Amino acid sequence: KKQYKRLLLQPFLEEFNKFGEVKTYWINGEHLYSYKQTWEKGDGVFESQEAIDPELLKKCHETAKKLLNDLSKDHEKLIQCRVDFACCIDNTNVCRDYFINEIEICPTIPEQESRGHGYVPLAQAVLKACV
């Protein structure tokens, strides 16, 4: 850790795994898809956005949209971004107080997350930004 001054090591938080992380994927400020992720024996377990509580998903989308709008005021518009939400640090009760856990500027797009539909919109957005 001492040698790498710009390395962020994120500890595994069991609370995040208990309630799952809601990950929202955006291209050019527009929501493309979301999913919920937990971990089991080192492997990611994914739930599609249809399986996420609609009210929770709506709140996450609204918060992420505000964040992306604020970021674009101070920096260039992000072509791709993933805004992750988590719940309940040091709290084992069921709650819905999700918060922004992570902002990934250039996230990966595994097939199981995007159901195979993430690459075409991303490629189109990149090409449009380059023209």
Spans of features found by a protein language model:
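Phosphate-binding site of ATP-dependent enzymes
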Residues: K1-D74, A86-I89, D97-F99
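C-terminal active-site "lid" helix and adjoining low-complexity regulatory extension at the edge
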Residues: H75-L78, C87-V131
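Catalytic phosphate/metal-binding cores of nucleic-acid and nucleotide-processing enzymes, i.e., regions
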Residues: C81-V83
